[in-house]
Amino acid sequence: MPSLLVLTFSACVLLGWALLADCTGGGGSGGAGPGRGRREREALPPQKIEVLVLLPQDDSYLFSLARVRPAIEYALRTVEGNATGRRLLPAGTRFQVAYEDSDCGNRALFSLVDRVAAARGAKPDLILGPVCEYAAAPVARLASHWDLPMLSAGALAAGFQHKDTEYSHLTRVAPSYAKMGEMMLALFRHHQWSRAVLVYSDDKLERNCFFTLEGVHEVFQEEGLHTSAYNFDETKDLDLEDIVRHIQASERVVIMCASSDTIRGIMLAAHRHGMTSGDYAFFNIELFNSSFYGDGSWKRGDKHDFEAKQAYSSLQTITLLRTVKPEFEKFSMEVKSSVEKQGLSEEDYVNMFVEGFHDAILLYVLALREVLRAGYSKKDGGKIIQQTWNRTFEGIAGQVSIDANGDRYGDFSVIAMTDTEAGTQEVIGDYFGKEGRFEMRPNVKYPWGPLKLRIDETRMVEHTNSSPCKASGGLEESAVTGIVVGALLGAGLLMAFYFFRKKYRITIERRNQQEESNVGKHRELREDSIRSHFSVA
């Protein structure tokens, strides 16, 4: 697994550091004294907050600039008082936002360095983004070095939870993949399950599903639950029969992450193999509140609809908990209008990223206000980022809670088919991340009916592990199993050889005694025979 922790800066970035250090005398440490803070607070109005947004220009991403920019501007109007008439910052405070194409790669880092170099060492006050893991890692390291607060609705992989050193200035305003893993753990505890197979798409590029199930695996591993895994590339021809065979050879509880069409294909293949009658439990993770990923929708208007409806009776979908409030409806309409003006027409105008970056502005402003009141300045990035941690505030879609490590708690729902005749689905359970509590909703029909799910976790299985589920530098489970089985077989063979040799030795000794008693008789008979022959001769 390519590790985020070993991503390195290029030589040009190191040179940029050296040049900028000469220009600015190095970055702040976040520990500026109150005296300096008071002086800057006195000169606060009028001032501007410079924000650098690093997101891809490519609209194939759910978090492209065209999709997220309307949400950021909506939030800025709110905090500047233009929308509500209530200002959250001192009069005269204005935001100056620069939008740069991250290209979901090294361009994000280069954009940051080039911008600072062009401004003769002047750094932005806030970084929003990037989202993609491989783009976010070097930017987060540089933000920590330069004492810049960095808020993102991305960088969701497990590696970013290590905030003690290189990611110390990162706050994640969307639930990380590990939070999804905590939800799955609570679900498994509820059902008293301990084993699962992870089936996911991995294109070796953005690797969203890989990082998602890596988070699930790490949480399960810490708690002693067993996982095996199977991955495939959706950009190539899929062998659905092969995927189903791997599931049959592994576990009865299946956690999947792939596009909605691929999920449908897997469920159809599983149904044809008789795997949707209660002996298997299928879970699909709908990433980012986007219907691109399997959202539980079985209907396509084709000849397979009836069969798909039957298959989906065994499928449950994990999605972010959705809340509805009047302000959110207004926000959604404005975002939709702005996005459509960009020439984009789709169902998912407001996904997890759009919500997250809106809430990132609110969170930053709340933290900045507290830092300014304490006598520090907008340049005290370490102080600001600490104020964004371990707090709860009201976001655009409901309450947002950030834990003590700067990661947002995740609230999730489980959606299942409750009417197999009509094929309708509804939420049957919810997980509340801050409390770590999973609850089934009352008065809903359980998807399998009473005691219909028959999962035998004691059976022997074959494991195909090709995933995030192996620890670097260690033996895979299959290797350990092979060693143990080989040792047992070897010991059995040695014991069998010992007893066989002992019995064989006793038999030989008995035969030798009998032969010694008869050897004289045989010799006499042979000699008599020889003599008789010679006599005949």
Swiss-Prot record:
Residues 21-41 form a propeptide. It is found in: Cell membrane. Has low affinity for peptide hormones in the absence of bound chloride. GO terms for molecular function: natriuretic peptide receptor activity; peptide hormone binding. It is a single-pass type I membrane protein. Residues 1-20 form the signal peptide. The keyword Transmembrane applies. Disulfide bonds join C104-C132, C209-C257. Residues 42-477 are extracellular. It comes from the Eukaryota. SUPFAM superfamilies: Periplasmic binding protein-like I (SSF53822). It comes from Bos taurus. The keyword Hydrolase does not apply. GO terms for cellular component: plasma membrane. The gene is NPR3. Belongs to the ANF receptor family. CDD domains: PBP1_NPR_C, TM_EphA1. Receptor for the natriuretic peptide hormones, binding with similar affinities atrial natriuretic peptide NPPA/ANP, brain natriuretic peptide NPPB/BNP, and C-type natriuretic peptide NPPC/CNP. May function as a clearance receptor for NPPA, NPPB and NPPC, regulating their local concentrations and effects. Acts as a regulator of osteoblast differentiation and bone growth by binding to its ligand osteocrin, thereby preventing binding between NPR3/NPR-C and natriuretic peptides, leading to increase cGMP production. Glycans are attached at N82, N289, N390. The chain crosses the membrane at residues 478-500. Residues 501-537 are cytoplasmic. This is Atrial natriuretic peptide receptor 3.
